[in-house]
UniProtKB/Swiss-Prot annotation:
GO cellular component labels: host cell cytoplasm
InterPro entries: Paramyxo_C (IPR002608)
Coiled coil: none
Protein name from the UniProt record: Protein C'
Biased composition (Polar residues): 36-66
Keyword GTP-binding assigned: no
BP GO annotations: symbiont-mediated suppression of host innate immune response; symbiont-mediated suppression of host JAK-STAT cascade via inhibition of STAT1 activity; symbiont-mediated suppression of host JAK-STAT cascade via inhibition of STAT2 activity; symbiont-mediated suppression of host type I interferon-mediated signaling pathway
Subcellular location field: Host cytoplasm
This protein's domain notes: The disordered region at the N-terminus is involved in C protein self-degradation in trans. This self-degradation of C protein may play a role in the regulation of viral RNA synthesis. The disordered region at the N-terminus is also involved in the host STAT1 degradation in order to counteract the host innate antiviral response.
Region (Disordered): 12-34
Length: 215
């Protein structure tokens, strides 16, 4: 058969152009069919391999079922950790206060007499003036600032109540002795180191009650 390529000066008949065009289309169709056939074969092989590996249980990771335990969340860990924290210092102070009231009749009478003088007599006025000056002279803290900004009558009442609290904390038990006071002071010492106002009030309370312990 003659070559399909002719010199440029020879004009190609129209019927030959149609034959060449049809042959080109046929070759393109055959090439496209082979490509589709090869692609289908490869896809089938991949699907078959995946199916075999799935049956063997070796490739697809399993997801946790409803009954299966999930990893502990960080928030849950933090919540569980907070349950085991050490008790706060203020809790230690409350524990000291809850150990019992004064049981010795003589000391109890002296204690109640002292507290009554604080609320009704000149001893109370002298006490609140001393506390006010000591709190005013100390390094400023939120608690000291709060007390200094109170109205005078309210401040005096608050200071007397705080003093009574410390008196009842320090002077109690079957018969309070100096060693008992020392033990109670050691228990609340960390709290007093953070609360300087309370430390000042406790010191003044002890100064007023020392004669009761020494009886």
């Amino acid at each position: 058969m003659a070559s399909a390529t002719l010199p440029a000066w020879i004009k190609m008949p129209s019927f030959l152009k149609k034959i060449l065009k049809l042959r080109g289309r046929r070759q393109e169709d055959e090439s496209r069919s082979r490509m589709l056939s090869d692609s289908s074969t490869q896809s089938y092989q991949v699907n078959q391999l995946t199916s075999e590996e799935t049956e063997a249980g070796s490739t697809i990771p399993s997801t946790p079922s409803k009954g299966q335990a999930l990893p502990t969340e960080p928030k849950v860990r933090a919540r569980e950790k907070s349950r085991h924290r050490r008790p706060k210092i203020i809790d230690q102070v409350r524990r000291v206060e809850s150990l019992g009231e004064q049981a010795s009749q003589r000391q109890k009478h002296m204690l109640e007499t002292l507290i009554n003088k604080i609320y009704t007599g000149p001893l109370g006025e002298e006490l609140v003036q001393t506390l006010y000056l000591r709190i005013w002279a100390m390094e400023e803290t939120p608690e000291s600032l709060k007390i200094l900004q109170m109205r005078e009558d309210i401040r005096d009442q608050v200071l007397k109540m705080k003093t009574e609290r410390w008196l009842r904390t320090l002077i109690r038990g079957e018969k309070t002795k100096l060693k008992d006071f020392q033990k109670r002071y050691e228990e609340v010492h960390p709290y007093l180191m953070k609360e300087k106002v309370e430390q000042i009030i406790m010191e003044e309370a002890w100064s007023l009650a020392a004669h009761i312990v020494q009886e």
